[in-house]
């Protein structure tokens, strides 16, 4: 059983149904103007039903950050050495928390740059409506830990759209929404990064699942207006 929301693109939903999944699409916004609270409430209802499904709960499960602490970060260091800057998007915050914990444990001087979408509440910002699935949350993930010395940055979704479409047309590479957000953050900060720095950017998704959204002219015009095409 998959519980998703109106921000999910139709291709992903069709893909899941083709694989035999039962997909529920919630349509009510939560108190913060997103869908996560509504989705979580529905999942809890399903889990509590007699014979209900098992829920691994990526928002609270400590195995989520643990695997990134033990494997993702180790793979980065083994291949590239200790980065000076490491850009990570904040969704469930599993990748972000796992890497931050590993950096602290290693005693590395790596600056972890945590990237979120404007309108997300994870870093304590004001909630607002968001349209691109991936990064951001309308409910603060329980696994997010304030103790880590993160450099936190917000990216407006219109800049995510511009970045994704620019890269697709200039570089011939189709980034997903989360990847575009993190790349937009790097673009905004690149002039502040000392020359010769070793920078690692975690790109978690590709753009095929965003063809009906970020890469669809009608969708972009409806949600962001004509200025989104200025890239």
Regions from the PLM with identified roles:
Residues 1, 8-13, 90-100, 178-186:
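Short glycine/serine/threonine-rich phosphate/pyrophosphate-binding segments
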Residues 1-3, 105-113, 189-198:
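Phosphate-handling active-site elements
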Residues 3-85, 117-168:
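Small/polar-residue-rich loop-to-helix segments that shape phosphate-bearing ligand pockets
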Residues 78, 101, 105, 184-191:
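Short, well-ordered alpha-helices that flank and scaffold nucleotide-derived cofactor binding pockets
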Residues 88, 154, 176, 201:
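Redox-cofactor binding/interface segments in oxidoreductases and associated redox assembly factors
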Residues 138, 187-231:
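Phosphate-binding loop/pocket of nucleotide- and phosphate-handling active sites
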Residues 160-162, 167, 183-192:
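A short, acidic, amphipathic alpha-helical segment used as a generic capping/interface helix at domain edges
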